[in-house]
UniProtKB/Swiss-Prot annotation:
Subcellular location: Cell membrane
Positions in the Cytoplasmic compartment: 74-135, 342-394, 622-739
Physiological role: Involved in cell fusion during mating by stabilizing the plasma membrane fusion event.
Paired cysteines (S-S): none
Any single Gene Ontology cellular-component annotation: mating projection tip
GO biological process: plasma membrane fusion involved in cytogamy
Protein name: Plasma membrane fusion protein prm1
Family: Belongs to the PRM1 family.
Bilayer topology annotation: Multi-pass membrane protein
Keywords carried by this UniProt record: Cell membrane, Conjugation, Glycoprotein, Membrane, Transmembrane, Transmembrane helix
Membrane-spanning residues: 53-73, 136-156, 321-341, 395-417, 601-621
Sugar attachment sites: N175, N244, N273, N309, N453, N482, N489, N504, N551, N566
Compositionally biased intervals (Polar residues): 662-677
């Protein structure tokens, strides 16, 4: 491949070596400290501090410092807004804490009217209950003893009627029977009497003969007449008739019991009307809490400490970033210096390739000027056996690591690193936000605590007044209820005693007493015992107890709003607010703005990085498209065989000690004679090297691939360094260093 350019286009007006030298331009060996037209190692090392990564790190530091300054400005503004919002919250909290003062009057009126209504309803209910119980007890007692009276009447009169009938039948039977017996005895005794009298008359006759007394005659007629006239007395059933007529009516007992029972009930109703008829709750006994003025913004350690903490974080981050990035910028100079030393040595070694005719001159320039990119390409290309593909791989790496591409890549990396530094700063600030949220929660807790204290004090006084009402009603009204139940129990006992006395007086000593006593116990005694147990229960449980007011009457709603899952329900939040309160919303707005800025910068840096990847993709697409094509032979339209070419063909020998003559041609023989003095020049090779790769013709119709990719990968000794000693100074060199 021929590269032909005029000497002026390559070295425009170069000053000759030694033009300033008193030696007259004579070529002399140069020492390491001599002046050269190119930068030596010392000169390169003197510019290490201006290397790409140091400058980028310093730019990142500048961006971070700008971000910190912007953060401080935004936080100062947020502090003012937060204090303003805190004042609003303080006013709201004071209003909330003073709500018991305004609502207590209404609640007191509601409580008093509720008690009055309850007492009025209680009065009506008690009057109805007392009247109902009174009538029920009277009705029950009347029903019991009237039932018992019916049973007694039925039993006694039935028994008396049966007894009287039996006695009448027995009397009639006995009267008729005795008369018949008397008549029969009269007839029998008359015959006996007549015979006996005859016998006696005979004896009297004999006795008179002998001078004795006469035997009296037997006369039974008077006795027989008495027997015939004998009958049961008519008064035999008078006792039963008297018993039948003496069955008790219990009218006296009924009247007595009814009067005793109604007396306590009438007294209770009278007391109920007197004590509860015009009941009025004393409103003055219910307290009215005083107004509250809360203060938690002035000198608030929470808000001030948060923003001071954020300022401290920003200041600390500023110092850390300055220290770390400056140290990193300084430390990166050391590997860059070492890299520059290695680059210098590699350039010196590879500069020998310029003297070798087997190399593509542009490839040699690329290898010498960009040793690391070239080395990376050579290493990557070593994985392929095909020389064409080796060239394409080297070309892709050279395309992706060109100065423009590396500038884009380094700019993208620096931008992303700056975003990372800003993100770390933002995370440090966001970690401090919960402290502010906790402090705002403490504000709400202070309001709720104030409401709790006020509500508890008010409830204590109000409950005391309600307790006094309970005591008064229990003593005045239900005390008489207790007395009434005791009196009714005593009345029932008196009723039982009176009834038992009547039964004892009426049927005592008779066969009916025990059966009637058992019937009384069964019908009335057991029922009265049950009534007495019920009255005893009423006596033990008759009292009123109005419910007390809760201690959290005024604070329950505020406390529930804080514990609610929906933070927008908090009394410190506006309706529809997305944050828990106004104060933290200010900080969230600042952090959101910073986060949005970081995201924007990250997108920009990502777009720049994408440009580099697109550039790499273009190179890969180009290389892959050439991977599939093959070199053609001459018979297939390919180039002809390579000729033995002079490596200097297409180049002009440019004298380094004199200004070249623009009128001479590149191949003029007089050019070498016009030189004032001989200068060191590269010796042409003693023999030509045959091409080891695919043939390439040096013609005007050179292919596009040859012009763009070169021949470095197509020659056997393309990457070999000549073992021939390069031009060296006669003076010792210290580390091959050049200034």
């Amino acid at each position: 491949m021929i590269f032909s350019r005029s000497a002026r286009s390559i070295f425009p007006l170069l000053p000759p070596y030694g033009a300033h030298d008193p030696q007259g331009g004579r070529a002399v060996p140069l020492q390491p400290d001599d002046i050269t037209p190119y930068m030596g190692l010392r000169a390169r090392l003197s510019q290490i501090w201006m290397n790409r990564w140091t400058i980028l790190l310093l730019l990142v530091l500048v961006r971070v410092l700008i971000a910190i300054a912007s953060l401080n400005t935004n936080m100062d503004s947020a502090r003012r807004e937060a204090l303003s919002a805190c004042t609003s919250v303080e006013s709201m909290g004071s209003a909330m804490a003073s709500m018991p003062h305004y609502s207590a009057r209404g609640i007191n009126e509601l409580t008093a009217s509720g008690v009055e209504t309850a007492v009025s309803a209680l009065k009506t209910m008690l009057t109805l209950v007392v009247s109902g119980v009174e009538e029920l007890i009277v009705f029950f007692i009347k029903m019991m003893y009237q039932t018992y009276l019916c049973l007694i009447t039925m039993a006694v009169r039935g028994t008396v009627d049966v007894g009287v009938g039996l006695l009448k039948d027995a009397s009639d039977f006995l009267n008729s029977t005795i008369k018949s017996i008397g008549e029969g005895i009269s007839d029998a005794t008359q015959t006996f009497e007549d015979g006996l009298n005859k016998f006696v008359d005979g004896i009297n006759i004999v006795g008179s003969v002998f001078g004795g007394d006469e035997v009296p005659d037997l006369d039974l007629s008077s006795f027989i007449e008495d027997l015939e006239n004998a009958q049961l007395p008519s008064s035999i059933d008078d006792g039963l008739d008297k018993l039948n007529d003496s069955v008790p009516t219990f009218d006296e007992v009924s009247e007595f019991v009814e009067n005793i029972i109604r007396t306590p009930f009438d007294e209770v109703k009278k007391l109920i009307n007197e004590s509860m008829g015009t009941f009025t709750f004393d409103r003055d006994t219910l307290p009215v809490p005083a107004k509250k003025q809360l203060s938690f913004c002035k000198g608030s350690d929470g808000i001030d400490s948060f923003f001071n903490n954020v300022s401290d974080i920003a200041e600390t981050a500023k110092k850390v970033f300055i220290a770390v990035l400056v140290i990193a910028a300084v430390l990166v100079c050391f590997p860059m210096a070492w890299q520059e030393i290695r680059r210098w040595r590699a350039q010196k070694e590879r500069s020998q390739l310029v003297r070798k005719e087997a190399h593509d001159p542009l490839d040699v320039v690329y290898i010498v000027s960009r040793p690391y990119s070239a080395a990376a390409g050579i290493k990557a290309a070593s994985r392929f056996s095909n020389s064409r593909r080796q060239i394409l791989v080297r070309w892709v790496i050279a395309y992706a690591t060109s100065p423009s591409a590396l500038f884009v890549l380094s700019l993208a990396i620096a931008g992303l690193f700056a975003c990372l530094c800003q993100y770390l700063l933002l995370r440090a600030v966001e970690e401090a936000v919960p402290e502010l949220s906790a402090e705002v929660g403490a504000f709400a807790d202070k309001v709720v605590a104030s409401l709790d204290n006020t509500s508890a004090e008010w409830a204590l006084s109000a409950n005391s007044a309600i307790g006094d009402i309970n005591t008064e009603l229990n003593d005045k009204v239900f005390g008489w209820v207790n007395s009434t139940t005791t009196g009714v129990n005593d009345t029932l006992n008196t009723f039982v005693d009176k009834t038992t006395g009547v039964l004892n007086d009426t049927f005592g000593g008779t066969l009916l007493y025990d059966p009637l006593k058992d019937v009384f116990d069964c019908l009335i005694g057991l029922k009265i015992a049950g009534i007495q147990r019920g009255l005893t229960w009423v006596h033990d449980n008759a009292h009123i107890d109005f419910p007390e007011l809760s201690n959290d009457t005024f604070s329950r709603g505020a406390a529930e709003s804080l514990s609610d899952d929906n933070s927008s329900e908090s009394f410190l939040s506006d309706a529809g607010a997305s944050t828990s309160n106004k104060i933290t919303e200010v900080v969230f707005r600042v952090t959101s703005a910073i986060e949005s800025g970081i995201a924007t910068e990250a997108l920009i840096s990502g777009a720049i990085l994408l440009i580099w990847f697109l550039n790499l993709l273009f190179g890969l697409i180009r290389a892959l498209s050439l991977f599939r094509s093959h070199d053609r032979n001459r018979g297939d339209g390919g180039p002809g065989p390579a000729a033995n070419l002079d490596p200097n063909d297409g180049f002009s020998d440019v004298p380094l000690t004199a200004i070249p003559n623009p009128h001479t041609t590149a191949h003029s023989a007089a050019d070498s004679q016009s030189r004032s003095q001989p200068v060191p020049e590269y010796e042409p090779p003693s023999r030509n090297f045959a091409s080891a790769g695919p043939p390439a013709a040096v013609t005007a119709q050179t292919t596009y691939e040859d012009e763009k990719l070169g021949f470095a990968g197509q020659r056997r000794n393309a990457l070999k360094v000549s073992v021939i000693d390069a031009r060296a100074s006669s003076y010792p060199e210290f580390g091959d260093e050049k200034r």
